[in-house]
């Protein structure tokens, strides 16, 4: 008897008509009456389940066994596939035999009722069994695969940057310090906040590289946009400028969304029904946007100030003097209202707002930096041209009181053929949250790490 998956059965139902099959999986749902029992069986191959049925008069032994089976139990089932063209599913399994592989206890937390998001977060080890989070994590996998597909297709080299580092790449001081690193490594060691520095080094040999891995920030933030451990996509290209960077960002975002829509359409439809029917139309809007709009930081301030002054919008923060850091409310207004739900590039930020390694523009006030803003989420991606002049970089570090002892290797690269380099960091979990229509980034990662708690 052939072992098959739910995915195979649903993709080609006619192929299995009247065939005997066996399948292993978990009981997602059970409906029972006096003389008939229906099981919904999931095997992980599809977001959809296989309906299995047995009548007491046809198979009293199997009927009796299934009366005792609890939700989440693991089973092996055998039977005959019957086509059901008038039902919701194209087929069902007429049970002949059932083996109860692991009986779940009756207090299984994910019973057939509504649960809050906080309930699911407190049961992160189980929530992937719920249809919503099954969909999110399947899309996470599809999105991860698409990242590698895009970069390899475009001749980028993968750099596996270290998790342990002696550098604070962003210079913000929000790092996790490794205990006993002074005695083990003979210097203070951190969990990485970015793979950028390593990527820059490799870009000077391969020209086009990327990293994709976990990063860590010791920010005590309790917003729906922040995690202490999250994943970053960080390409770096030698001889590139801001224009090249924005084209790469736009191409990458469109490619990733297309791949999700092609390879996880069932999962997107589930999330659209669960959260918002706008999810899919929003994704289509991004794909169809020929060129993402671009505005200067100073222009963004002028737009925000005009809207605030004319009372078109009531911002919580109304100070729009040069040098203010744009808040999420400002970013969302620009994307959603002024640019009518389009992605938006904002470029040339004040150098005081950005990291020390960004190239200073000729006005000596701004840096060649870019952020990509998306509707409903705000900033999702940030990048820049890198400062290639060694003396300029040293002066910048000095003005910010950055100790360069652990950065000597990074500075030294400028001595030996470092003409130009540009790169960006794209928040993988934020992008996933946007694609899935999630309001909280904690629901986009398997086991969220946030300030104040770590339970798994």
From Swiss-Prot:
4Fe-4S listed as a keyword: no
Enzyme class: ligase
Keyword RNA-binding set for record: no
Keywords: Aminoacyl-tRNA synthetase, ATP-binding, Cytoplasm, Ligase, Nucleotide-binding, Protein biosynthesis
E.C. number(s) listed in UniProt: 6.1.1.22
GO terms under biological process: asparaginyl-tRNA aminoacylation
Pfam family, one: tRNA-synt_2
Catalytic activity: tRNA(Asn) + L-asparagine + ATP = L-asparaginyl-tRNA(Asn) + AMP + diphosphate + H(+)
Subunit structure: Homodimer.
HAMAP family registered for this protein in UniProt: Asn_tRNA_synth
Name of the protein this chain belongs to: Asparagine--tRNA ligase
Native organism: Mycoplasma genitalium (strain ATCC 33530 / DSM 19775 / NCTC 10195 / G37) (Mycoplasmoides genitalium)
């Amino acid at each position: 008897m052939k072992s098959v998956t739910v995915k195979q059965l649903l993709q080609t139902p006619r192929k299995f008509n009247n065939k005997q099959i066996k399948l292993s999986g978990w009981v997602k749902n059970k409906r029972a009456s006096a003389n008939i029992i229906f099981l919904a069986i999931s095997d992980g191959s599809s977001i959809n389940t296989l309906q299995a049925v047995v009548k007491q008069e046809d198979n009293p032994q199997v009927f009796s066994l299934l009366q005792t089976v609890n939700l989440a139990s693991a089973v092996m089932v055998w039977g005959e596939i019957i086509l059901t063209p008038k039902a919701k599913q194209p087929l069902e399994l007429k049970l002949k035999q059932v083996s109860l592989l692991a009986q779940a206890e009756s207090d299984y937390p994910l019973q057939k009722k509504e649960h809050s998001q906080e309930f699911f977060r407190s049961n992160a080890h189980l929530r992937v069994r719920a249809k919503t989070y099954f969909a999110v994590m399947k899309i996470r996998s599809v999105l991860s695969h698409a990242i590698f597909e895009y970069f390899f297709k475009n001749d980028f080299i993968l750099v596996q940057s270290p998790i342990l580092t002696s550098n604070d790449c962003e210079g913000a001081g929000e790092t996790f310090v490794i205990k006993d690193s002074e005695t083990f490594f003979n210097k203070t060691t951190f969990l990485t906040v970015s793979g950028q520095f390593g990527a820059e080094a490799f870009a000077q040999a391969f020209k086009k590289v990327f990293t994709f891995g976990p990063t860590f920030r010791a920010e005590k933030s309790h917003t729906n946009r922040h995690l202490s451990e999250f994943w970053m996509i960080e390409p770096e290209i030698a001889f590139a400028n801001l224009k090249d960077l924005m084209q790469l960002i736009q191409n990458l975002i469109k490619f990733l969304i297309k791949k999700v829509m092609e390879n996880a359409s069932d999962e997107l439809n589930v999330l659209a029904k669960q959260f918002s029917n706008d999810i899919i139309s929003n994704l289509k809007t991004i794909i169809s946007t020929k060129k993402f709009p671009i505005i200067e930081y100073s222009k963004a301030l002028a737009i925000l100030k005009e809207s605030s002054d004319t009372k078109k919008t009531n911002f919580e923060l109304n100070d729009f003097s040069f040098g203010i850091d744009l808040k999420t409310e400002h970013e969302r207004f620009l994307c959603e209202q002024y640019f009518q739900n389009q992605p938006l590039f904002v470029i040339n930020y004040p150098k005081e707002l950005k990291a020390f390694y960004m190239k200073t523009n000729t006005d000596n006030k701004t840096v060649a930096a870019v952020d990509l803003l998306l509707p409903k989420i705000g900033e999702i991606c940030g990048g820049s041209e890198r400062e290639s002049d060694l003396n300029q970089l040293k002066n910048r570090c000095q003005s910010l009181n950055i100790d360069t002892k652990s950065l000597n290797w990074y500075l030294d690269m400028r001595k030996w053929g470092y003409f130009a380099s540009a790169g960006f960091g794209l928040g993988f979990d934020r992008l996933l949250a946007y694609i899935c229509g999630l309001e909280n980034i904690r629901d986009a990662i398997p086991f969220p790490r946030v300030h104040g708690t770590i339970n798994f």
